[in-house]
Amino acid sequence: MDPTCEESPAEDSNNEEEDLDSTKAAPRIRDTPEDIVLEAPASGLAFHPTRDLLAAGDVDGDVFVFAYSCQEGETKELWSSGHHLKSCRAVVFSEDGQKLVTVSKDKAIHILDVEQGQLERRISKAHSAPINSVLLVDENALVTGDDTGGIRLWDQRKEGPLMDMRQHEEYIADMALDPAKKLLLTASGDGCLGVFNIKRRRFELLSEPQSGDLTSVALMKYGKKVACGSSEGTIYLFNWNGFGATSDRFALRAESIDCIVPVTENLLCTGSTDGIIRAVNILPNRVVGTVGQHAGEPVEALALSHCGHFLASSGHDQRLKFWDMTQLRTVVVDDYRRRKKKGGPLRALSSKAWSTDDFFAGLREDEEDAKAPEEVVRESDDDDDDSD
């Protein structure tokens, strides 16, 4: 459990026990849990909805569940599963936290018991192509997307899929759901944002294709905006109910944006191939700073803890890292026209982000990139959205 959530120990009236306790070294409490070192890079990452547990699926097909703590030496592996035959690409906990759903390049869906790590159900050949993403709809329903653009809706109580559609031409990189759990949004390698009505089990539309792969998708601004990361390092914004074309685009100083995770309604974090985890404000569009990095190794996945205090990241360095979100969650960007000084470093937003004498302090955002947030194509209703 996080130190802020732990109850203070009751006072012990026994003087002898107090003397014994005083001889023990007090456990060191860190700002974040210690790094977890794996034997292979993790491509799937998920926090438990209520407990201090982190699940990871790696490229060897192994799935792990860890208990994490800020008390030094207390972060540990609870169990692992090697049932997948190929790379585990995504993991997600059920709403009640009792099940863990995993999908793999081996085309299978696995449902495991969180307490014991036992495989409760295997759906072999769930797709005709390797599965790349999974999204939980409710306690019974889930959606999966594969490498050829196929989307399938499943009810865990039934055998076959409830919905099977293939509107995209390339892999399904990421998916998101509106709060009403009616519309499914899909980011695809074909550069299109897809919209599916899973309540009525029908396809709605595809957006105009962008110049790069869409690698990630998230709802922002209380559902008024949809943000998509791309392989070209650009964040594309869509208005809700205006999915046909982008309303804004925002280029980062990054080769690509491989994953994004919302932190607040205005702020999100991005993971890129340069190993940098950037904090980005949406409308006004600006890189706020850096949360951390994986020493130049690509960032594969990001996840936010149930309490919102920690961001977890996995990289090609085979490490799972934790980052403190406390400072970032207090950031407010309200000066739209202010520009960063030329050659200035990215602002450090956590104690573990690089300092001025660090190797990564050489990373600079030049003036051209500083202008990028302000040189976006804007729809007429964007200013109204930003003022809400």
Swiss-Prot record:
Function statement: Nucleolar protein that acts as a modulator of rRNA synthesis. Plays a central role during organogenesis.
Protein name: WD repeat-containing protein 55
PROSITE patterns recorded: WD_REPEATS_1, WD_REPEATS_2, WD_REPEATS_REGION
Biased composition annotated in UniProt, kind: Acidic residues: 1-20
Protein's UniProt keywords contain Repeat: yes
Keyword line: Cytoplasm, Nucleus, Phosphoprotein, Repeat, rRNA processing, WD repeat
GO cellular component: cytoplasm; nucleolus; nucleoplasm
Domain of life according to the entry: Eukaryota
Coiled-coil blocks: none
Disruption phenotype: Death before implantation of the embryo.
GO biological-process terms attached to the record: rRNA processing
Family indicated by similarity: Belongs to the WD repeat WDR55 family.
WD repeat extents: 37-76, 83-122, 126-164, 167-206, 209-248, 251-290, 293-333
Chief place where the protein resides: nucleus
Phosphoserine carried by residues: 355
Signal sequence segment: none
Region entry Disordered, spans: 1-33, 364-388
Gene: Wdr55
Cellular compartments annotated: Nucleus, Nucleolus; Cytoplasm
